[in-house]
Structure formats: structure tokens, C-alpha cells
Amino acid sequence: MKLHRAYVYDHVRAEGVHVSLTSAEAVDVEGRLYADIGGDRSYLTPVSEGWHETEAAAREEAAVKVAAMAERLTAQAERIRNGGR
């Protein structure tokens, strides 16, 4: 599950879980979501307030990416209509 501004710290690996994730991801280990939200090293569960804030940020980030992609495709279609210019 990818989340905005989430980072899995060494304490996850200390529990015997090998992870290699970017700053845009978190990992669910036995029902617990391990992540860093705003510098707070802890794990979050889907019912915690941090989860909802992070989920909302992830949705917002995805919406921005989709809008940017739509703009690029629209511009590409316009160039094709204009003979590739």
C-alpha cells in the first residue's frame, strides 16, 4: 500500500521483517501498518487518525498525478489534430 510521506524505519527490520521501501510507501506487517508520518516513528493502524490523514494525502497526490496526465494527453491530442506541430 503506497502512502504519501510514509517511511518504514529500522525497527520494522528489527522484528525480522525485511523491507526496502521508498519515502512514498509503508508496509503492512501482520495487520500493523509501519510508517513515519511527519517524523513520528511508530506504526499506525487503519483506525488511527494518522492513517486517515495519510490516506487523504495519498488520494490527493494521486488526483494531481491523474490531472497532470490528462493535461499531457490533451496537449498531445491537440498537436496531432494540428498536424504534429
Language model features by range: what are they?
Residues M1-G38:
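Short N-terminal "domain-start" leader segments
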Residues M1-K2, E78-R85:
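Short intrinsically disordered terminal tails
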Residues S23, D40-V47, R79:
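Short, solvent-exposed coil/turn linker segments
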Residues I37-D40, K65, R81-G83:
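Short C-terminal domain-edge/linker segments immediately following a structured domain
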Residues Y43-A57, E61, K65:
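A short, exposed loop/beta-hairpin motif centered on an aromatic-Gly-Thr core
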Residues R59, V66-L73, I80:
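Amphipathic alpha-helical coiled-coil segments
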